[in-house]
UniProtKB/Swiss-Prot annotation:
Family according to the record: Belongs to the Thz kinase family.
Pathway: Cofactor biosynthesis; thiamine diphosphate biosynthesis; 4-methyl-5-(2-phosphoethyl)-thiazole from 5-(2-hydroxyethyl)-4-methylthiazole: step 1/1
Name of this protein: Hydroxyethylthiazole kinase
Catalytic activity: 5-(2-hydroxyethyl)-4-methylthiazole + ATP = 4-methyl-5-(2-phosphooxyethyl)-thiazole + ADP + H(+)
Gene this chain is encoded by: thiM
Binding locations of ATP: 125, 171
Any Gene Ontology biological process: thiamine diphosphate biosynthetic process
UniProt entry keywords in alphabetical sequence: ATP-binding, Kinase, Magnesium, Metal-binding, Nucleotide-binding, Thiamine biosynthesis, Transferase
E.C. designation(s): 2.7.1.50
Length: 262
């Protein structure tokens, strides 16, 4: 199985496009991570909007550059709003991304996410256990935590990509991005990133934004993984622990955008 690597030039080009286009991202995400997700998008130059009311969500999905569906704090009313937004995004050809949080551990959200797959997401981002569960390979995971290595989920991710037409992102010590034919691996990051709530969810929002960019969508999404890992490495070098990591991480994202504009 061939796994390609992303070049720094590809990553820099995608970040330049990101800053240039400043996607408006409709984030229907979980309650725990909304502020961090919004700040991550802002630091990179995107515009976040957290619209969750059913009538508003359906309308906003038509005008946003991209839509994120994150089921981390799923409720029945929220599921209805998400379904309405996805249906409108499909009609309006708005790219949308699914983050199937804890789908391997909880049956209600697994059924809901499987239903959403019929609307053909542009991208799917999850950890190894989530991707394997969504692909029907195995149930598992410890809530939002993975119990599988990312590399073990590559075959499931490739199958899921081929079946849905989505670009699938499996995150872990190494991130893997695949469209079912090409697979790109992104190294880097730091274990401390797993001790801060929302780094994966924020990545899903950046992935959603990248789906709205021109050019090679797989490379743009792989670049999103690279930016987050780069920023994580820089932040860890300046941090004393999870508490001081977050502001340094946001600063590092901002600095990355400034460097590609120089």
């Amino acid at each position: 199985m061939q796994v390609d690597l992303l070049s720094s030039a590809q990553s820099a080009h995608a970040l330049h496009l990101f800053h240039q286009h400043s996607p408006l991202v409709h984030c229907m995400t979980n309650d725990v991570v909304q502020t961090f997700t919004a700040n991550t998008l802002l630091a990179l130059g995107a515009s976040p909007a957290m619209v969750i009311e059913t009538e508003e969500a359906s309308h906003f999905a038509a005008i946003a550059s991209a839509l994120l569906i994150n089921v981390g704090t799923l409720t029945q009313p929220r599921a209805q709003a998400m379904s309405a937004a996805v249906e409108q995004a499909t009609r309006s050809q708005t790219p949308w991304t699914l983050d199937p949080v804890a789908v391997g551990a909880l049956d209600y959200r697994r059924r809901f996410c499987v239903e959403l797959l019929s609307h053909k997401p542009t991208a799917i981002r999850g950890n190894a256990s989530e991707i394997m569960a969504l692909a029907g390979v195995a149930n598992g995971g410890r809530g939002v935590d993975t119990t599988d290595a990312a590399a073990n989920a590559i075959p499931a991710a490739q199958t899921l990509a081929r079946e849905t037409g989505a670009i699938v992102v499996v995150t872990g010590e190494v991130d893997y991005v695949t469209d079912g034919r090409r697979t790109v691996g992104i190294h880097g990051g730091d274990p401390l990133m797993t001790k801060v709530v929302g780094t994966g969810c924020a990545l899903s929002a950046v992935v959603a934004a990248c789906c709205a960019l021109p050019g090679d969508t797989l490379e743009n999404i792989a670049s999103a993984c690279h930016w987050m890992k780069q920023a994580g490495e820089r932040a860890v070098a300046r941090s004393e622990g999870p508490g001081s990591f977050v502001p340094h991480f946001l600063d590092a994202l901002w600095q990355l955008t400034q460097e590609v504009q120089a």
